[in-house]
A protein has these predicted regions:
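Vicinal oxygen chelate
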Residues: 1-5, 25, 34-39, 58-134
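N-terminal beta-strand motif that seeds the catalytic metal site of vicinal oxygen chelate
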Residues: 1-11, 22-23, 69-74, 121-134
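Membrane-topology and secretion signals of cell-surface/extracellular proteins
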Residues: 42-55, 65, 69, 118-127
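Short beta->alpha connector loops
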Residues: 27-29, 52, 78, 100-101
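Core segments of cupin and vicinal oxygen chelate
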Residues: 1-45, 50
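A short, polar/proline- and glycine-enriched secondary-structure boundary/capping micro-motif
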Residues: 56-60, 130-132
Length: 134
């Protein structure tokens, strides 16, 4: 779960980024301050608006840097398409697509609308062929 300023906007952003869907009734009033991002039956991410309900750790969005030391890491099986979605969203790219030699996969590091660092990575070993050719 991450705290965000605008649940509806963040939900749309992550749905596009991850080729996922929001759970439940899109018109439910609760969706203004909480949403779940799903891929099939799998819960991928929860979003909660800052300063709502009785969650003491979700108060004061400007008290400190958001997500310092936290990476939202998603393995995607469609890495090239995911990079295309990043470009369409106009996301701030921290690190362009590259091969991480340890897990032998490709990664792109970006920032979401609330300044959280998001990493999209292909499955481990996916880039093994390219490493042998270089």
């Amino acid at each position: 779960l991450i705290a965000v300023r605008d649940v509806k906007a963040s939900s749309a952003w992550y749905q596009t980024l991850l080729a996922a869907k929001a759970a439940g009734d899109p018109d439910h009033p609760h969706r203004l301050f909480y949403d779940r991002i799903m891929r099939g039956d799998a819960l991928i991410l929860q979003l909660h608006r800052w300063d709502d309900e009785e969650h003491p750790n979700l108060a004061g969005p400007d008290r400190g840097p958001h997500g310092h030391g936290v990476l939202l890491w998603f393995e995607v099986d469609d890495f090239d398409a995911a990079v295309d979605r990043v470009r369409r969203l106009g996301a701030r790219v921290i690190q362009e697509p590259h091969v991480n030699p340890a897990p032998q996969h490709r990664e792109i590091w970006i920032q979401d609308p609330d300044d959280y660092v998001v990493v999209l990575a292909s499955p481990d070993g996916e880039a093994r062929q390219g490493l042998r050719e270089s």
